[in-house]
Amino acid sequence: MLIHFDAMETTLIPHMRGGEKEVSAQMYSDSLGKIMRGRLIPGASIGLHTHETSSEVIYILSGAGKVLCDGMYEPLAAGSCHYCPKGHEHSLINDSQEDLCFFAVVPEQ
């Protein structure tokens, strides 16, 4: 299956998972999971949440920020990848002065 993000409508998600500001995203989802290309403007975040029935992989396309995973902060930059296993919690934070663009896959398990 081909997923063409540039052909998808951009959705603005305010305060995603209780985070700051909004996430702009193109997203594909079905019963097996979600695939998303997203953007966080400076100061925006995806709030802290636990992956009860899924895991998540986030690959940073451009920009920089940090992730809070199980109480520990990890820096993120273009080319880095974050993995949150099933049963763990995390939050994606753009604490930089530029947009943070990412690709995320959330497979149900």
Where are these regions (language model features)?
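Glycine- and acidic-residue-biased ligand/ion/polar-headgroup-sensing regions
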Residues: 53-65
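Short acidic-glycine-tyrosine-enriched beta hairpin
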Residues: 72-86
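Ligand-binding loop in jelly-roll beta-barrel domains
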Residues: 86-109
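Short beta-strand segments in beta-sandwich/barrel cores
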Residues: 45-46, 63-68
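Structural motif
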Residues: 64-66, 73, 89, 99
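A short, N-terminal "cap"/entry segment at the start of jelly-roll beta-barrel domains
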Residues: 1-34, 47
